[in-house]
Amino acid sequence: MSGPERITLAMTGASGAQYGLRLLDCLVQEEREVHFLISKAAQLVMATETDVALPAKPQAMQAFLTEYCGAAAGQIRVFGQNDWMAPPASGSSAPNAMVICPCSTGTLSAVATGACNNLIERAADVALKERRPLVLVPREAPFSSIHLENMLKLSNLGAVILPAAPGFYHQPQSVEDLVDFVVARILNTLGIPQDMLPRWGEQHLVSDE
């Protein structure tokens, strides 16, 4: 199996809930164990942007997402924001990588300054201190100088800043194609196989030169 086997996926309150849900589905399809964290703001955004209504309690949410993604029992583990005994809170038991998708600029700021006010922020802090892959997927426009400074700081610390900015060279035909573009880039960054998006040049079979 290439890429990390255990991944923390956090969703925060930026627009773009579809990205997080699609990424979760893809990770399940690739037989990864996912530790799922979600902020209250992200739950509100998800209810606004999708037809997915997550239960409030972690145990009920875990059962819902397991059925929603067709996951095996125990493949998706959901932890509350104040569950400080959860594996992502400790460097000795945290998953091999973490993705925050979508990542709000508030969460971006908290991670950049080392704040650990909730489990999402603590899990990101653990990923940084343990030098494990950390991918942040901000969805904001325009970016302020503060946002850009926080991104630069995190990039210098080893995190990957992967904005939710779809490309168009694959000629997308639907919103789902645009979502898949970003999710495919996340999977590529983690080293996890994906067949949603051809790599540049793969479909270029004939040259005029």
From Swiss-Prot:
It catalyses: dimethylallyl phosphate + FMNH2 = prenylated FMNH2 + phosphate. GO terms for molecular function: carboxy-lyase activity; flavin prenyltransferase activity; prenyltransferase activity. Dimethylallyl phosphate binds at Y169, R185. FMN binds at G13, A14, S15, S39, S104, T105, G106, T107, C116, R139. The keyword Glycoprotein does not apply. SUPFAM superfamilies: Homo-oligomeric flavin-containing Cys decarboxylases, HFCD. It is an enzyme of class 2 (transferase). The keyword Flavoprotein applies. Its EC number is 2.5.1.129. Keywords: Flavoprotein, FMN, Prenyltransferase, Transferase. Flavin prenyltransferase that catalyzes the synthesis of the prenylated FMN cofactor (prenyl-FMN) for 4-hydroxy-3-polyprenylbenzoic acid decarboxylase UbiD. The prenyltransferase is metal-independent and links a dimethylallyl moiety from dimethylallyl monophosphate (DMAP) to the flavin N5 and C6 atoms of FMN. Belongs to the UbiX/PAD1 family. PANTHER family: FLAVIN PRENYLTRANSFERASE, FLAVIN PRENYLTRANSFERASE PAD1, MITOCHONDRIAL. This is Flavin prenyltransferase UbiX. The lineage of its organism: Bacteria, Pseudomonadati, Pseudomonadota, Gammaproteobacteria, Pseudomonadales.
